[in-house]
């Protein structure tokens, strides 16, 4: 017999750094999910990723208090900020540039994000990443 779905939730947790403190603990606890079990499973799955990289995670939880999780790749903005060596995007992106990235770096980011992007090929994924860069005030050369 199939498990009865109780709901889904989305969290953004740093890779390898899930712990029961807020915001993870309360978000899971109020839905009846075993917090320590989630933290151990999440940290085990993300141990090969860069520590501290924000990982969007979709958690599907069931009425029997079990859960499954899908860990996605870090946001394109995270990769772009890292490639451009900036702390944050521009406050006025159309008028201000905070850094530059090369087309090769954009391609590398698009390849890393490909499984989570809504694109058919690498060129489409690059356009999505270019749009993110433009909206952050990062120039592509």
Curated annotation (Swiss-Prot):
Keyword terms, alphabetized: Methylation, Ribonucleoprotein, Ribosomal protein, RNA-binding, rRNA-binding
A GO term, aspect molecular function: structural constituent of ribosome
InterPro entries per UniProt: Ribosomal_uL11, Ribosomal_uL11_bac-typ, Ribosomal_uL11_C, Ribosomal_uL11_C_sf, Ribosomal_uL11_N, Ribosomal_uL11_N_sf
Gene3D superfamilies linked: Ribosomal protein L11, C-terminal domain (1.10.10.250), Ribosomal protein L11/L12, N-terminal domain (3.30.1550.10)
Annotated GO CC locations: cytosolic large ribosomal subunit
Post-translational modification summary for this protein: One or more lysine residues are methylated.
Quaternary structure and partners: Part of the ribosomal stalk of the 50S ribosomal subunit. Interacts with L10 and the large rRNA to form the base of the stalk. L10 forms an elongated spine to which L12 dimers bind in a sequential fashion forming a multimeric L10(L12)X complex.
Record-stated family: Belongs to the universal ribosomal protein uL11 family.
Protein's UniProt name: Large ribosomal subunit protein uL11
Gene label: rplK
């Amino acid at each position: 017999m199939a498990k009865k779905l109780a709901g889904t939730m989305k969290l953004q947790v740093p890779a390898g750094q899930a712990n029961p403190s807020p915001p993870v603990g309360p978000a899971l606890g109020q839905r009846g999910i075993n917090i320590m079990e989630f933290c151990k499973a999440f940290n085990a799955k993300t141990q090969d990723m860069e520590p501290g990289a924000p990982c969007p995670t979709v958690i599907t939880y069931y009425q029997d208090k079990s859960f499954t999780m899908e860990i996605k790749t870090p946001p394109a903005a995270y990769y772009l900020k890292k490639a451009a060596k900036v702390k944050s995007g521009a406050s006025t992106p159309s008028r201000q540039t905070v850094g530059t990235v090369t087309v090769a770096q954009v391609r590398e980011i698009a390849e890393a994000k490909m499984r989570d992007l809504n694109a058919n090929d690498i060129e489409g994924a690059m356009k999505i990443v270019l749009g993110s860069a433009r909206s952050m005030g990062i120039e592509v050369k």
